[in-house]
Amino acid sequence: MGREGAFLFDQYADGSLSSTKGIYAYWALLTDVLSKERMDAFVAELDNKETFNRLHRVPSLAANHPKYKDNGRYWQGGVWPGANYMVITGLLQQGYRKLAYEIARNHYDNVLKVYKNTGTFWEYYAPEHEEPGFMARPNFVGWGGLAPISGLIEQIFGIRSNVYEKKLTVDVNLTEAYGIDRYPFGLDGLVAIKVKSRSSATQEPQVEITSDVPLELTVLWGDKQKTANVKPGTQTV
């Protein structure tokens, strides 16, 4: 891999570099190969309206590439739920929570609009229209189910768990009330979470949690956080 500015490109057998910007480069988000300075510049490309910040984020091919298609045409710009999940997970791992939420919300909203229009979930989606991708397969709840299930719970509701360390995070971005019931936590645990409505995104959230197992709860909002040790039963953090 090499760089043009801060992007990562495929290297051919002869040592030369491709000039194609594709979503596959963002697997690097799940590694520690880049310095913080380079990572910041690399991630910033996801907000570039000339390349990856399109109507439906994130296209698999940069929009300024000559082979980019507005209907996706599979990997010529198509928005793939699995690839998006990789990008969003990587952004969260690297600490870019705000951008991760923006992309997750954009993807979820577009998938929901297509679902309302067609009655189903699709293999992949068009980057420039609220439509399935060109020749995408319908009723595709393999990776097509990532946005309405994992995307909603982990990225929009912000409920993420580390069962091995007995830790649960609620990353609150919404201002309206929301919650989840019977959230599985490990082999035996069940958790219910209710986040109360807020008047603004900067207001400290109040989270009611009911758990039948002990765990450590961290609540995030903006650049702030609070942590509590939760015992079996119900309490508000």
Regions found by a protein language model. Give the residues of each.
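Extended amphipathic alpha-helical segments enriched in small hydrophobics
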Residues: 1, 78-114
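Extended glycan-interaction surfaces of carbohydrate-active proteins
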Residues: 1-79, 112-132, 151, 157, ...
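Aromatic- and histidine-enriched alpha-helix N-cap/loop-to-helix transition segments
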Residues: 19-23, 78-86, 140-147
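Short glycine/serine- and small hydrophobic-enriched flexible loop segments
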Residues: 30, 85-93, 147-157
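Structural helix-adjacent loops and short alpha-helical linkers that scaffold large soluble proteins
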Residues: 32-46, 91-104, 160-164
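Catalytic cores of secreted or luminal carbohydrate-active enzymes
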Residues: 137-185
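Carbohydrate-binding surface patches
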Residues: 176-220
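C-terminal beta-strand-rich structural cap/linker in extracellular carbohydrate-active enzymes
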Residues: 217-219, 226-237
